[in-house]
Amino acid sequence: MSIVLAGCGAASDVRAPNRDATLLLDFRPNAVHTGIYMAVDRGFDTALGVTLRIRVPSSSSDAVKLLVARRTDFAILDINDLAIARERGRDLVGVMAIVQQPLASIIAQPSIRTPRDLEGKRVGVTGLPSDDVVLRSIVAGAGGDPTKVRKTMIGFGAVHSLLTRRVAGATAFWNAEGVVLKARRPGMRVFRVDDYGGPSYPELVLCVTRETLQDSPALVRATVAAISRGYEEVISDPENGVSSLLDATTGLKRKDVQRQLDAVSPSFTAGARAFGELDPARLRAWARWRWGKRRRIVTRELNVARAFDGRYVPPAGRD
């Protein structure tokens, strides 16, 4: 099985798309999105002929639905939700990694010393299929029985649900809700999926439909290049990256975003040659792990070469 390497072998299409495009986030705006907001703030998108419109999801299930309905051009998906969507016949393709490491975790009350302690307890989930993967993987990885956990739907309300003790734990991102919760309640536990048997993999991936990839390659190339430059700027100038996010959104506190960015920024390029790289070996390792009997999330093995196309990512060291 082969996969196109980032920056290699792409069919050349250097024409500017000269059009608007929508990009749907995976979650409420937070530090992991700073590069996207920086790209728009600095005009990296318009310089390449695309005007990006950033949209925030109203619910956890928005991304796949809106991509398939052609109501958004791009969407950030959890890599596991991409796998599930493809298994369900949705021909979506990951074209760029936003991070190179897992962000998934279970955040739990201070009394929960190990994920095994969540047996018989109420644990909040957003409703995304990938939440079940995270919950099963972490609890089973700690020697517990995931079927004994009482799941309850909380949407994107992990912070509130944990602070009010509505739940004993919740699936959430350690770099976002985890940072906020540990600052507000220092004893909170954070159980990361890669600490319980998971491999290193790009948690968040920029995705498009196969039709967009085939019909609008110039749009995909320009958007990926603009976002890549945005994240490169954030890595070199994190303070202004925070400002770009805060200037475009409401309800965020600078100190919280700065803490989140400090936590997540190493994940932007960890183990990669360039920002956004989709490494074939890493993707295959993730697919094999997910295909394991205890953590199966699809009914057949994922075709990595069809699910990802990394050739639009600018290579390291390009001007």
Pin down the residues of each PLM region:
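Short, glycine-/small- and polar/acidic-enriched structural segments
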Residues: 14-164, 168-175, 190-192, 200
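Secondary-structure end/capping motifs
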Residues: 214-295
